[in-house]
Structures are given as structure tokens and as C-alpha cells.
Amino acid sequence: MARPLDNSGKKLLESFARTSEEIFSLNEFEELLKSGKQIRIKYGVDVTSPFLHIGHAVNLWMMRELQELGHKVIFLIGDFTTQIGDPTGRGDTRPIIPREEIEKNAEEFIRQAKMVLHFDDPNLLEIRKNSEWFSEYSLSDFLKLLAMVTHARLISRDMFQRRIEKQEDIYMHEMIYPILQGYDSYVLGSDLTIIGSDQLFNEMLGRFYQQKLGQKSQVIITTKITPGIDGKAKQSKSLDNYIGLGHSSRDKFGRSMKIPDELIVDYLKIYTTVPMGEISRIEKKISSDPMKWKKFLAREILKRYHNEVDVKNEQEWFENTFSKKITPDDIPVLEVCESQWVAIDLVKKYFNKSKSNSELRRLFEQGAVSFNDRKISAFDEKINVVSEDVIKVGKRTWFKVRVEGK
């Protein structure tokens, strides 16, 4: 008789149903939970950039639940494969990243992941790098790996098909990438991996290689992906439509308040721990007071990463600043030597190249720049500044001027 699923396993499946898209396969996952063995969960990251957002954290929180049941995360830093570049989701070839940058990104990635995962217990988490095996991998062994998979299978990938339609190049190292990622699963003896659906092709190759090489195939769980805070494309640093784990509590709250009303329920389901029954009741009330429930959502997102004092302070700051129109006291100071400025030059100095001239001009044209509460629409207007003057740019940026000697 098959061993029944215990209460902890049932609760885990119920919790995972909330954030998972697909499980390959559910029966295999249930058997894994019933087995009583410590599950080895592969979490592979190619550290092309050092930031994590709350979409990535969905996977981390699921792994945290598994850790709390005694299972082990193998935190795999793809330092070797990062040098190749994952073509996933790209219509062009990813640039090669220097090793020094990879190491720096990995450190920052781990720092942010520690906000969720248990890193301090070696029985619950182990850090590995795939350069451990690939840097010493022989050409003959690699050719054996290649011989197991067909060109037709690799080229069937949707992003490659899109490039073919556009008559754009596909480089050989990009086709090899999923083979290497798949082989990682075999080396680590992965029982389970939790990924975004965009990584499914690569991890299915992991199952394939495990079968070919005589190992039990890993279970794959893909997680739900929401639009970013702009309500359009998924969260991305390049689009600046994300809530980052590395963002301050203030930024997290402010960015949460940008979420479109129609996404409040989805964000509550996927990025918070509010019970589903309560979310169903909230869904019926949102249209009558969306601002109230958006603040509720912002608080619930913050609770996962910050303490109650921070949550309370950030809501008060937001309400004072944006509802009561009170200029905050703790705004940054820009120190300057001169009193006479062209408006755009002063604003440009504050942003220190993080915004282009065209972006800044557009802000002036939109009436989004003010000097001591007076709107400035002409970017080339000459202004005379003294210490304690306040410049506001957009809805959420202020800075105070301090003139040397004045």
C-alpha cells in the first residue's frame, strides 16, 4: 500500500497551489514528499545582474517552506554558464560578462536571497558553483553530452524560432547553454527545481539528462508570473517596473502603490501570505475604495521583508507626502558651489547621469519639476538658489540645495 501524504505534505501542496503554474509531475512530487527522504532542491542562478525582485522571491519563499520541513536547497551559482550567457527571453545575443563582475554579482545576489532563505544551516542550504565541474570538463565528455540530444530538439525552442523567422543569428554557444544547465541537475542529484516558466525548456533538458545518465528525474515546479507594477510586461530592471528585494522599505511601499487596481488581487495571492478566503472578500470591496486596499497590499508586501515599525513608518510617510502634500523632512541634500544655475543643469547634477538629457527635458515639459513649489516648464530657465531651497522632480523625488558658504 502506498504511503499516505502527511499533514505537512498536504499543507505544502495547498500552499504551492497558490503560486505554482505547473508541476512536472504532480504525482512525482507527491511521491517525493511521501518518501521521507531529504529533498535536494536545485536553485540555479546565472548572475548576469545582482538584483532580485519579488517575482524571483516567489521561488525563494517556496523553497523556504521546504527548508522548514527539513529539505535542502542547493544554491547553484552558474559562474561558468554566466560567461556563456542564457539566451532565455532574448531576441539578441547576451554579452559576455567578466569574471570579476560575476563574483561581485554573486555576492550581492546571496545577500538579497538571505532575506528569505536559511543560509546559516549547512543541513538546509549548500552553495555550489558549476565551474567546479565544467572548468575541468574534457572535450570528449562534452561531445558525449552533445551526442545525446538532437539539433531538432534544441532549435525547436521558441526564441530560436523567432530569430529564424526574422533571419537573425543564433550562435552555437547559445544552443549549448541549456545542455549545460540540464547537466547541472545530474551533477547535483537534483530531486526538485522551482523556476519561472521561462526556464522550463532548460530544466526539461535536466530531466532528460538525468534519465539518460541513469538518475531519477527531478520534479519541476514553474511559478506564476505577473505583470510588473506598470501593469504591462513582467518585472524587469531595464523597464524599472519591479519591486526589488534590495529596495529600501520606502521604495518598496512607494512602488507597491503604483500597482494598477486590477492587479491588487493577483499581487495579494502571489506576493503575500494573506489567506485566500480573505482575498476573496477583499476582491468584492476593491472597486469601492481601491486606495485603501492598495495600501493594505503595500503593507503586506513589506511585512515579508521588514519589521512592523518600518511598515507603519512607511505608510505614514507615504500618506503625509502624497495625500497631505507635506514635503518630507528627510530628503537628500545636493551640495553646490554656485548660486546661479540653468534649471536642467541643477537637476542633472542631482541625478548624476542616471537620467538622460531627453528624460529630464521631458519632465520639464510635463510640468513635473518644481522649485520651492513653483513649477518650472522651461528646462533652460535660469534660477538663483540659496541653501534650503527644495526641488521636486516627478511625484517621488525631492532634494534640498545647500550652497557652499551660504
Residues covered by each model-derived region:
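N- or domain-start disorder-to-order transition segments that initiate the globular core
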Residues: M1-S35
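Short acidic, glycine/serine/threonine-rich loops at helix termini
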Residues: G85-G89, Y137-L143, G231-Q235
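A charged helix-plus-loop insertion that forms the helical arch/lid used to bind
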Residues: P87-E103
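Divalent-metal (Mg2+/Mn2+/Ca2+)-assisted nucleotide/phosphate chemistry catalytic cores
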Residues: P98-I110, K114-T222
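Buried hydrophobic packing segments
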Residues: N59-L66, I179, E203-Q210, I301, ...
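N-terminal catalytic cores of NTP/NDP-binding nucleotidyl/phosphoryl-transfer enzymes
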Residues: I23-P87, I194-L200, G206
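Conserved nucleotide- and phosphate/pyrophosphate-binding catalytic cores
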Residues: F201, Y209-K406
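Short, hinge-like loop/turn segments at secondary-structure boundaries
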Residues: R90-P95, K144-A147, S238-L239
